[in-house]
Swiss-Prot record:
Residues 76-91 have a biased composition (Basic and acidic residues). It comes from the Viruses. Keywords: Coiled coil, Membrane, Transmembrane, Transmembrane helix. It comes from Acanthamoeba polyphaga mimivirus. This is Uncharacterized protein L310.
Length: 164
């Protein structure tokens, strides 16, 4: 049996070894130190002395934004009222849109204290879509009209001219 241990000889005194490690060990650097110090300087030089001015400016901006939203809502309401008046004056023969409009108008008068079930913009969107559908295709004058028609073929039949 081999009882010999492989021991390393201690050639350097432990005190000297500690001093060497302290000298050779690189210092721990904080990666974000320049950023932290820069933000710290910016805060102390600019923000801290003017904090009340900054708060005042933020409050003024919030008030201006609130006023802008109110004025915009009032203008939209006026436009909506103008379109309602124009719609009443117009002689539109579209019965579907009139039914929807008058049904909504009557529900407004009956439930004036309640919140509207259908928003005015949604109503205008419905009217727009109905008018768009009606304008998409002209009224049909022929009774036996079917798609696809070949208008350049004699008689306008459903069969393509090249298939005969």
């Amino acid at each position: 049996m081999d009882i010999t241990k492989h021991l390393k000889p201690n050639l350097v005194d432990p005190n000297i070894e500690e001093s060497i490690i302290k000298k050779l060990k690189p210092p721990v650097e904080d990666y974000w130190a320049p950023t932290k110090s820069g933000l710290h300087k910016f805060y102390h030089n600019f923000i801290r002395p003017n904090i009340y001015l900054i708060i005042f400016i933020i409050i003024v901006l919030l008030l201006l934004y609130y006023r802008y939203r109110r004025v915009k809502a009032d203008k939209e309401k006026e436009k909506l009222e103008d379109t309602d008046k124009e719609f009443d004056k117009s002689t539109n023969n579209d019965t579907n849109s009139k039914k929807i409009y008058h049904r909504q108008k009557n529900s407004k008068t009956l439930n004036s204290s309640k919140k509207q079930s259908i928003d005015d913009t949604e109503l205008l969107l419905q009217l727009y879509n109905l008018n768009k559908e009606n304008l998409r295709e002209p009224p049909i004058t022929k009774s036996n009209f079917a798609y696809p028609m070949y208008p350049y073929h004699k008689g306008g039949t459903l069969i393509s001219p090249g298939s005969r």
